[in-house]
């Protein structure tokens, strides 16, 4: 997430995701860190379900929701996936609070989003961060840490 000092006001309302600059694209991230929590897929076909867990990437700062080494994350965590304008349609697993997903679905940003509130602390203040996260290196049984099963693959 970047500072929005050099960004056009309300750019997310006037530009499509494809029209955004790299700075605007990065500024959309609210810093909740939910995309850095592990997901578990069970079943196949129409019965395939996605489960969200409290298991975080080892680089995630559990208190702030920020990556501990953002610039090198792809070199350190081999399964870290870069969200881009081209692959966004493949990221149906993003949380329903994610700005990228919301804008892709034609929805508005929530009041607590830093671009709306003007505060980088609004995500934490709105209680959006996952509580009681645990790093992947400290987990033996993933099933103990499932927190949601709200998605069925299409």
From Swiss-Prot:
Q: Which residues form a coiled coil?
A: none
Put simply, this protein is called UPF0260 protein HI_1355
A Pfam match = CxxCxxCC
Provide the family line: Belongs to the UPF0260 family.
Q: Which pairs are disulfide-linked?
A: none
- Organism, as annotated: Haemophilus influenzae (strain ATCC 51907 / DSM 11121 / KW20 / Rd)
Recorded hits in NCBIfam families, A to Z, give: PRK05170.1-2 (NF003499)
């Amino acid at each position: 997430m970047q500072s929005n000092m050099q960004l056009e006001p309300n750019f997310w309302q006037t530009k499509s995701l494809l029209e955004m600059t790299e700075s605007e694209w990065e500024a959309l991230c609210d810093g909740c860190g939910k995309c850095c929590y592990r997901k578990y897929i069970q079943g196949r076909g129409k019965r395939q379900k996605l489960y969200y867990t409290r298991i975080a990437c080892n680089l995630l700062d559990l208190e702030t929701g920020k990556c501990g080494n953002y610039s090198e994350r792809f070199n350190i965590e081999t399964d870290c996936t870069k969200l881009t304008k081209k692959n966004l349609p493949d990221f149906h697993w993003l949380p329903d609070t994610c700005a990228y997903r919301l804008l892709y679905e034609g929805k508005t940003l929530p009041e607590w989003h830093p671009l709306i509130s003007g505060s980088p602390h609004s995500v934490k203040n709105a209680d959006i961060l996952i509580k009681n996260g645990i790093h992947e290196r400290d987990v033996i049984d993933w099933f103990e840490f499932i927190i949601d099963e709200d998605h069925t693959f299409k």
